[in-house]
Amino acid sequence: MERNEVAPGMLLVAAPDMASEDFERSIVLIIEHSPATTFGVNISSRSDVAVANVLPEWVDLTSKPQALYIGGPLSQQAVVGLGVTKPGVDIENSTSFNKLANRLVHVDLRSAPEDVADDLEGMRFFAGYAEWAPGQLNEEIEQGDWFVTPALPSDIIAPGRVDIWGDVMRRQAMPLPLYSTFPSDPSDN
């Protein structure tokens, strides 16, 4: 299978047999990729914490379910905001957005919510992030732990009932769609 390159706005899709329990059935959106580091947030791990309890000023822009997501094991006291802009928004000239891909943006949470409200279709908030040292992610991809694929805006603001991992797997070339219903515990099969 052809391998996509890691870049901001790309997804890391955990292989069905990934050994790490921290990233089992995970989808990580890459926010930064450079020779020094790669970091992103797990967009598929919702917590029981309401955004209203942590960032009440951002609730109106938060897509349902309005829960804080667990972005990764590092710096869980830090919150990352991701958004999907409305069609036609000039992302390149915005001081509040860092473009990741098409309409996907990393939102500067120092901005006032009312300053970005007209530009956003929806947002998600993530406590913590995942980070890889130089060469570490490439090694994990070569071992078959991750597949790399482009993100869609719907991946970020998907309703709570959506199995994001399964949906992303179904979009891939064969044989990956065959694993889209792979249970987190194979003994459940």
Curated annotation (Swiss-Prot):
Protein origin, superkingdom: Bacteria
InterPro entries given in the database record: AlgH-like
GO cellular component: cytosol
Family as reported in the entry's similarity comment: Belongs to the UPF0301 (AlgH) family.
NCBIfam families referenced in this protein's UniProt entry, alphabetically: PRK00228.2-4
PANTHER family: UNCHARACTERIZED PROTEIN YQGE, UPF0301 PROTEIN YQGE
The name this protein goes by in its record: UPF0301 protein Cgl3084/cg3414
Species of the source: Corynebacterium glutamicum (strain ATCC 13032 / DSM 20300 / JCM 1318 / BCRC 11384 / CCUG 27702 / LMG 3730 / NBRC 12168 / NCIMB 10025 / NRRL B-2784 / 534)
Lineage: Bacteria, Bacillati, Actinomycetota, Actinomycetes, Mycobacteriales
